[in-house]
Amino acid sequence: DWTEWLIKERQKNLDKSRKSSLWYHQPMQKDIQAYHLALVKEDSVICDALFTQITRALPEAEYKIWHRHPVWFLEGNPIVGYHKLKDCVRLLFWSGQSFEEKGLDKEGSFKAAEARYTSVKEIDAKDLARWLKKSRDIQWDYKNIVKRKGKLERVK
């Protein structure tokens, strides 16, 4: 299958360049690999860096492609994810407005907050680690938002 071949070929090249990289990570699921492979190189590098830091900081989280983008969940509740926008990669924390952190901007009408990146150099590892810790500790119940007819309740 073409996707399998493309993943293997790209992985060979990426493995060579990542061996010495700060962002080197464990193998990712094939659907997330395919998501990264569909991006231009610069955006793929940003997503690789985010993937690595998120999986290291939240090893207990389940992650998968959800609504066509990589998303991490704790006990079924979406916590963090990223996706390609027209001019950047957006990192989204579902409960991020409650973190009260500089560098995260309000997104939408619920509790989400975002950071946007156009280069991997813009990712501040210390800020990201702090935000990821808060994403575990501060959560709004998005898992049951439909059941509660759009009303969010704090779970942590």
Please report, for each region that a protein language model flagged, where it lies by residue.
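Tryptophan (W) side chains
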Residues: 2-5, 23
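Charge-dense, helix-prone N-terminal extensions
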Residues: 15-156
